[in-house]
Amino acid sequence: MQAILLAGGLGTRLRSVVSDRPKPMALIGEKPFMEYVVHELSRHGITDIIFAVGYKGSMVEEYFGDGSGFIAPDGTPITVHYAYEEELLGTAGAIKNAGRFVTEDSFFVLN
């Protein structure tokens, strides 16, 4: 199963707290928030992740890479794709842009 994780916004409301990284990479304890999301998705069989990234998206890609460093609890490897936005596309635009990686009839979208 696949999921598109929308992670391309500017995070202006959290800028004073998380100025050095994109909002999904905000640290919760020792890990970025998005790692917890990926883990929970993988627990439920969603192991093909598409990150829709824009602002500081390279930080997301540097952290998650191709997903090979992350394994679902059942041992399934996690696969990661990146749909970069050259300019902010908004929610629907980001989903459309990430759609080129969708290979299944049904998929999840998380914001």
Task: Provide a role label for each language-model segment.
Residues S16-S19:
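Conserved catalytic-core motifs of eukaryotic protein kinase domains, centered on the activation segment
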Residues Q2-L5, R13, L27, K31-N111:
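Conserved N-terminal catalytic core of the sugar/cofactor nucleotidyltransferase
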Residues G9:
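Active-site glycine-centered loops adjacent to acidic/histidine catalytic or metal-binding residues
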